Regions:
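Long, contiguous binding/interaction regions
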Residues: 1-10, 14-49, 55-159
Length: 159
């Protein structure tokens, strides 16, 4: 059972796409000692807005405080908490090519991924799944001695 005082939370923030907005949001977290586990930012197509997805840890009370503080920032238009969201995370993993090439391909397919590049000595796979399943993929991938694993931040969308 997760510790509700330090539970993983995802907050999605819709902001005006202008300079210094990201700095103001990260400063809000830093000034209060809140940790950001993952941060992704992307413009919203056909608008002057951006979508910021922040993964952090904390209690329900702490998340309420963060949400209230975010609402006070002028370029923030909407704040959505993780219960209302579908989350995905992406991973790129590089493996040495060996006799287990098929196993690596099957493993990545089991986690909504596949082979994205094959070189003479290396294979690169991409996996995109829920954060818990990404953690399991990374654990399972260790048996194939990955040379490198790069995790992207969480992206989320309201249900």
């Amino acid at each position: 059972m997760p510790n509700i005082l330090n539970e993983r939370r995802v907050i999605s923030v819709i902001v005006l796409n202008e300079s210094s907005v990201l700095s103001r949001i990260t400063s809000l977290f830093a000034a209060r000692g809140y940790n950001i586990e993952s941060l992704t930012v992307a413009p919203i197509p056909n608008s002057d807005m951006s979508h910021i997805t922040i993964a952090t840890n904390g209690s329900t009370k702490l998340m309420e405080q963060i949400t209230k503080q975010l609402h006070k920032l002028i370029p923030v238009y909407k704040v959505i908490e993780h219960e209302e969201m579908v989350e995905k995370e992406m991973v790129l993993a590089k493996f040495p090519i060996a006799e287990n090439l098929a196993d690596i391909s099957v493993l990545s397919a089991a986690y909504n991924g596949g082979v994205v590049n094959v070189g003479e000595e290396m294979i690169i796979v991409m996996v995109a799944d829920e954060p818990k399943r990404i953690k399991h993929f990374i654990e399972a991938a260790q048996r194939y001695n990955p040379c490198e694993i790069v995790c992207g931040g969480v992206v989320a969308i309201e249900r």
